[in-house]
Amino acid sequence: GKPDGAFXDNITVVESVXFXI
């Protein structure tokens, strides 16, 4: 989960956990 969008253009719960953001 990154502001620029690792998978999307927003930060999801999955991204937050995975990336830690």
Swiss-Prot record:
Induction: By infection.
Main location: secreted
Membrane spanning stretches: none
Cell compartment(s), UniProt: Secreted
A GO CC annotation given for this chain: extracellular region
Keywords: Lectin, Secreted
Any one Gene Ontology molecular-function term assigned to this protein's record: carbohydrate binding
Tissues showing expression: Hemolymph.
Disulfide bonds: none
Function: Binds and precipitates antigens of the parasite Echinostoma paraensei.
Protein name: Hemolymph 65 kDa lectin BG04
Organism, as annotated: Biomphalaria glabrata
Gene name tied to this protein: BG04
